[in-house]
Amino acid sequence: VRLRVTGVVNRRQLLAALVTVGLWPEGARSATTAQPTVQRRWASGNTTLAPLGWLNEQLLFNGDRTLGRIDPQLDSPVWTVPHGLSSPAVYRPRAAGQSVISGGQRELGAWQFDTGQARWLQKAQIQIGTPFVTPERSYVGDGHTLMALDNATGAVAWRFASTPDTLAAYAPTVAGDTVFFGPGNGLLYALNAPDGRLKWQLDDSKEWQYIRQMFVTGQVLVAGTYTELLYGIDVDTGKILWKFKAGNFINSHHVAGDTAYLWSPTGWIYAINIHNGSVRWRHQTTRYGNRAANWAPMMAELVTFERKLYCLDMAQVLHVLDAGNGEELQRIAFAHDLRPTVSPLTSTTAAVASNTGEVQLVQW
């Protein structure tokens, strides 16, 4: 096969070309390759989209200007409204019950899920963080304080103050009647969800400052730090059950069932047993001495769907792995720039967000 190259070809275009002509680097040949086609395009009214949300078979989007809901079966959004925030919406919209929750660093707001009608807007006293949303309440940081907001009215049910001059930028999480909160002071708090009363606190500040993400499965809180450590913590007592050292910072992790998945910049995808922190499997993404086979770094969150793990790298290649054993099943190379978000809808379709502000339904 002879390839004629003119002008400047970037890595993404080269990967797409290799897929087209049936070529692929050594080390990736066990995975099938595919090129996606765009089946539907939805204009969002945004220049820059945040990651997409998903609830009840509906896509949710927000960005620098608007908030909206999409039925993937329809050619036009169900509704799109100007969000009216004084700064861009920076995280994916959350939804639970009848509310869609969206915000930026200066405000947090709620909109009606069915119609997009605005319900309330809560202005920051210091800086709004990322919320965790339940059907009745939204839990969100404002500066060093955690607030519990009523989803119907925006009324503050309670506040819990941590150490001044810290920023609770990352989302808390909720399991049963407990809210878990790590505001960036090296502490993890367990609070009583109805009234904000402190149940226990864990101080491991010698190892972490921020807790970036938290998931609860059964009796285990899986907490990622903005360092190289992933924790398993007993939800009732705060006892550390295990620590996993990834070898470099953990951008994000994902929990499905009794397995936590993460990408480490050391060049591995790990699947971790959440009960004891042992490695179920690992998949190499950086092959030293064979740069052509390397994955690009990842900003997008890992996603599981129908026992597959979806990993979108920064070269716009979607890697599909068997979630049970880590075998790479498929590589899907996009020829256009994407935002770091992917929402699998079926085994051959997904929703993605383009760098031009479109939400796209793609098929491969």
List the model feature ranges, each with a label.
Residues 1-9, 16-23:
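N-terminal secretory signal peptides
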Residues 34-54, 79-94, 118-133, 159-175, ...:
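Extracytoplasmic beta-rich repeat domains
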Residues 59-60, 100-101, 138-139, 179-180, ...:
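Conserved beta-propeller blade signature
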Residues 62-64, 103-105, 141-143, 183-184, ...:
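Structural signature of WD-repeat beta-propellers
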Residues 72-74, 113-115, 151-153, 192-195, ...:
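Short loop/turn segments that connect beta-strands within beta-propeller blades
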Residues 117, 145, 155, 187, ...:
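Tandem repeat domain/solenoid detector
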Residues 339-364:
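Blade-level signature of beta-propeller repeat domains, shared across WD40, Kelch, NHL, RCC1
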